[in-house]
Amino acid sequence: KHGGATVFQPLSTGITFALTEKVPADKIPLITSGYGRSDTADGSMFKWNFPLIGHYWVAGDTVLQHIAKTQGGWDKLKGKKIAVVFHDSAFGKELLPIVTERSKMHGFELLLLPVPAPGVEQKAIWLQVRQQKPDFVVMQTWGVMTPTAIKEAVATGYPREKMFGTWWSGAEPDLKDVGAAAKGYSAVMMQH
């Protein structure tokens, strides 16, 4: 009342997790646009959270739908292997429930590859990709982690045409210095 915040928009998944527990008592709406806790889309459980224009489950599912479409349908993913390279944080792990559920529904194998912050040391991750030979790689990355992943994919010979990112994984400022090495890489995007 009188001088307090009318709304929180933290612009951070980690902060969103912390505030989600606090906003019901404070009765201040928490707005997230494309980030935050995906499970807050259930308004019956999270009455003070308002995830606008999608969340990480939407991004992950959109990527998986695209992969399924390029293969001729969901049934064609049965027996395939999809690696998920993700930032080892609340942000990165947000993708895991939807890819895990889709894996169970459609019979593809998941290879989960967490990358510790800040994401500049990925050689071991991409050696695993080379050894495990996934049919596709889905990336839940951001910042320096994204160009590092693409450079390591090049170094290990993994084709960028089989790499797909969620929205922060396609940020132009993060990819511009990679140049031609990123050719073939795709990411779903909100307006950036």
Label each PLM-derived region with a short phrase.
Residues 1-6, 11:
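N-terminal (or domain-start) structured segment
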Residues 2, 38-39, 47-156:
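Extracellular/periplasmic Venus flytrap/periplasmic-binding protein
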Residues 17-24, 150-154:
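Short Gly/Thr/Asp-enriched flexible loops that form oxyanion-binding sites at enzyme active sites
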Residues 36-42, 58, 169-174:
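Short gly/pro/ser/thr-enriched loop/turn and capping motifs at secondary-structure boundaries
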Residues 46, 153-192:
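Extracellular/periplasmic periplasmic-binding protein-like sensory domains
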